[in-house]
């Protein structure tokens, strides 16, 4: 540092008074960056020089100044030569010398930042320099201001989110808020809030966080006339206030009709408010400053009380409350097995309401036990009551049974039904469906064990063949036989159901078929001509021939007759069973009918023969000379020596056999054709049932 003598200082001040003012000039800089150098740089700067550089950058920027070279005269507190950096109202730095000391400072690596868009840099040199000083080389640039981080003025900072960009910034708000017109304050759209429930909770926006600024909120509680709303402030109550002026900034106000409560602010919650009306408006206002947490209130409505209710016998009331008031509703229901009875109308539940005048909308109904009513009748069956006095109410029990021994219950169900809580008779398996009574097949009351074996076609005992049917013309003349299947079907030979065909032209036309009105079915028949009280004369509904029936060869010689009404099953009328398995050679079968005995005359009563089943090859050999063919749908029976056979008038009749294990009779065949009735080596040929069983069941639906 240069030594300053008293005399030099005195001379300096004297010269300053004697010499004219130092020449000075100003340079205006408006670029975003630039360079500033002392006069004459890099040579020595002149004495008595003063230059000012005024740097201005756009809004949103500040100025950064740094020095690459600095070499000025040293002086105490930079009294001689110096560089001064300042703004309009603030000196940012003063530099001089070659290195920093206790009394002078050089910029070194220091960066000078302006707080705003303006910076002034002034260089000044005094009247003399004893040494050579090279001055300075400085650079400046505009740098972006991060307003989001550096904004100190609360009134200009963003409420929620601040987004900086080069040269400026903008504000945005959280979800549910909108930006105020000042572009920094976030407010909520909180007007028009409507509450119509009888109880509820209302809070300031974002409670318990600070509520938004510059907001005008309104909340309306609007209930049905007859209610009275009460308000209760809860938990935190924190609204900006003023120590001297009541609620000048933020406040909450309550309006109900002509009454007004408030404004309220501060940290003390208002007392509970009973508005005595059904419609209340709550107003809340906030200004553009403050960080207060807001308020929370609950409301509830009360009305006139209604009298206490007594539930009906065998019933209940829901909900069960100590007190019921206006608009409360209760649901009356009954215990399981009971129904609500109101004004002679039965229903599951009944609802009543407490009215605004304190009266119930209706009287409590009664509970009536469920009645399933008289059980439905069962076809071919009967019903008995298991409960005393033939009760039909809830949990009463009945039992269905079939008319034995002629009918049996399908699937062997118990037949027990209980009156359910829904008012229906219900079975564990069948639910609401009635059981089905199926005809018992192949179990005649009169056992064949009671008579000796029949030879050469002897009269059959009455009732031993209860399935045999007589096909009779309306004049009473019989023409064929048949077998009862199920409750209303008769199986016979197809050739029985049409007129005789011309041997020269054996084509079956529909006009040759018998009409249902051309004949009738007689069940329970024993005598051929005479009638007795056990006979049942039945009308024919329709006839169906086997689709593969050939009238020339008698292949598939089967026909079904559907009855218009079901016969009454008894000791003399019962269906025969369909076969469960194919028949085997040698099995003894019984053929019955009212046909001629050995081509001489018709018998007076039902006749039967017992013969064995014959091997189909043996049967075919017997008919080969006659050019007759025995097909797979046919079965033969008879004795080689002859003497026992079905004859004219027996066509369509049954050939049956007994299953000893099941003690049931099964249909093996239907009398179809033969040659020379009862002659040696002339077996009877029958339509075989087993291979045609599927077709029979498909048409009739009959199951054993």
Curated annotation (Swiss-Prot):
Signal sequence, start to end: 1-24
Region (Homodimerization): 25-189
Domain EGF-like span(s) in chain numbering: 144-187
Record region (Interaction with MBL2): 25-189
Residue ranges of every copy of the Peptidase S1 domain listed in the record: 454-701
SMART domains cross-referenced by the UniProt entry: CCP, CUB, EGF_CA, Tryp_SPc
Disruption phenotype: Mice are smaller and more vulnerable indicating developmental and growth defects. Mice serum has low C4 and C3 cleavage activity together with low MASP2 activation.
Cellular compartments annotated: Secreted
One of the record's GO cellular component terms: nucleoplasm
Positions contributing to Ca(2+) 2 binding: 144-145, 147, 164-165, 168
Regulation: Inhibited by SERPING1 and A2M.
Lineage: superkingdom: Eukaryota
Disulfide bonds: 78-96, 148-162, 158-171, 173-186, 190-217, 247-265, 306-354, 334-367, 372-419, 402-437, 441-577, 480-496, 619-636, 647-677
Residues that carry a glycan: 54, 183, 390, 412
EC numbers on record: 3.4.21.-
Site-annotated residues for Cleavage: 453-454
Pfam family name, one: CUB
Subunit: Homodimer. Interacts with the oligomeric lectins MBL2, FCN2 and FCN3; triggers the lectin pathway of complement through activation of C3. Interacts with SERPING1. Interacts with COLEC11; probably triggers the lectin pathway of complement.
Functional description taken from the UniProt entry: Functions in the lectin pathway of complement, which performs a key role in innate immunity by recognizing pathogens through patterns of sugar moieties and neutralizing them. The lectin pathway is triggered upon binding of mannan-binding lectin (MBL) and ficolins to sugar moieties which leads to activation of the associated proteases MASP1 and MASP2. Functions as an endopeptidase and may activate MASP2 or C2 or directly activate C3 the key component of complement reaction. Isoform 2 may have an inhibitory effect on the activation of the lectin pathway of complement or may cleave IGFBP5.
Protein name according to UniProt: Mannan-binding lectin serine protease 1
């Amino acid at each position: 540092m240069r030594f300053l003598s008293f005399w030099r200082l005195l001379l300096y001040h004297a010269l300053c008074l004697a010499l004219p003012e130092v020449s000075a000039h100003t340079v205006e800089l408006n670029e975003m960056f630039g360079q500033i150098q002392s006069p004459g740089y890099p040579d020595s700067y002149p004495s008595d020089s003063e230059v000012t550089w005024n740097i201005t950058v756009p809004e949103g920027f500040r100025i950064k100044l740094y020095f690459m070279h600095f070499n000025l005269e040293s002086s105490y507190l930079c009294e001689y030569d110096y560089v001064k950096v300042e703004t309009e109202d603030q000196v940012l730095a003063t530099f001089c010398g070659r290195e920093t000391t206790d009394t002078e400072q050089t910029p070194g690596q220091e960066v000078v930042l302006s707080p705003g868009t303006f910076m002034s840099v002034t260089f000044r040199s005094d009247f003399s320099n004893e040494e050579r000083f090279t001055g300075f080389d400085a650079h400046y640039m505009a740098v972006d201001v991060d307003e989001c981080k550096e904004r100190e003025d609360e009134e200009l900072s963003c409420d929620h989110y601040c987004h900086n960009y080069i040269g400026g910034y903008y504000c945005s708000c959280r979800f549910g808020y909108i930006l105020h017109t000042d572009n920094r304050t976030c407010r909520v759209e909180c007007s028009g809030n409507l509450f119509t429930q009888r109880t509820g909770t209302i809070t300031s926006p974002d409670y318990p966080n600070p509520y938004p600024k510059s907001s005008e909120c309104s909340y309306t509680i609007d209930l049905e006339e007859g209610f009275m709303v009460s308000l209760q402030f809860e938990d935190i109550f924190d609204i900006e206030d003023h120590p001297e002026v009541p609620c000048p900034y933020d406040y909450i106000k309550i309006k109900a009709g002509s009454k007004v409560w408030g404004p309220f602010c501060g940290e003390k919650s208002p007392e509970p408010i009973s508005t005595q009306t059904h419609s209340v408006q709550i107003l809340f206002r906030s200004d553009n400053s403050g960080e207060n947490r807001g308020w929370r209130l609950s409301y509830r409505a009360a009305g006139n009380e209604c009298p206490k209710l007594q539930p009906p016998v065998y019933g209940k009331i829901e909900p069960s409350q100590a007190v019921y008031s206006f608009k409360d509703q209760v649901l009356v229901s009954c215990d399981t097995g009971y129904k609500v009875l109101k004004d002679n109308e039965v229903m599951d539940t009944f609802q009543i309401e407490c009215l605004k005048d304190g009266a119930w909308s209706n009287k409590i109904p009664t509970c009536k036990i469920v009645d399933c009513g008289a059980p439905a009748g069962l076809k071919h069956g009967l019903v008995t009551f298991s409960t005393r006095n033939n009760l039909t109410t809830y949990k009463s029990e009945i039992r269905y049974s079939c008319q034995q021994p002629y009918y049996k219950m399908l699937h062997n169900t118990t037949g027990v039904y209980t009156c359910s809580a829904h008012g229906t008779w219900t079975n564990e398996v069948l639910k609401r469906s009635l059981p089905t009574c199926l005809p018992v097949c192949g179990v005649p009351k009169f056992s064949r064990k009671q008579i000796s074996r029949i030879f050469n076609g002897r009269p059959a005992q009455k009732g031993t063949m209860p399935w045999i049917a007589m096909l009779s013309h309306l004049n009473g003349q019989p023409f064929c036989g048949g077998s009862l299947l199920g409750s209303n079907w008769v199986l016979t030979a197809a050739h029985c159901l049409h007129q005789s065909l011309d041997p020269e032209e054996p084509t079956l036309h529909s006009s040759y078929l018998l009409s249902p009105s051309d004949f009738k079915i007689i069940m329970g028949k024993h005598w051929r001509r005479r009638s007795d009280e056990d006979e049942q004369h039945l009308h024919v509904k329709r006839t169906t021939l086997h689709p593969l029936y050939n009238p020339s060869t008698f292949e598939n010689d089967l026909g079904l007759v559907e009855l218009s009404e079901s016969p009454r099953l008894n000791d003399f009328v019962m269906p025969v069973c369909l076969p469960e398995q194919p028949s085997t050679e040698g099995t003894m079968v019984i053929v019955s009918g009212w046909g001629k005995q050995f081509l001489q005359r018709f018998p007076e009563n039902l006749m039967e023969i017992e013969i064995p089943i014959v091997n189909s090859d043996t049967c075919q050999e017997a008919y080969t000379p006659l050019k007759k063919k025995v097909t797979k749908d046919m079965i033969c029976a008879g004795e080689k020596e002859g003497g026992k056979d079905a004859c004219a008038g027996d066509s369509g009749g049954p050939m049956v056999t007994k299953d000893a294990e099941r003690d049931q009779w099964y249909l093996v065949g239907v009398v179809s054709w033969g040659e020379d009735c009862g002659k040696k080596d002339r077996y009877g040929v029958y339509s075989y049932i087993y291979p045609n069983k599927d077709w029979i069941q498909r048409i009739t639906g009959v199951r054993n």
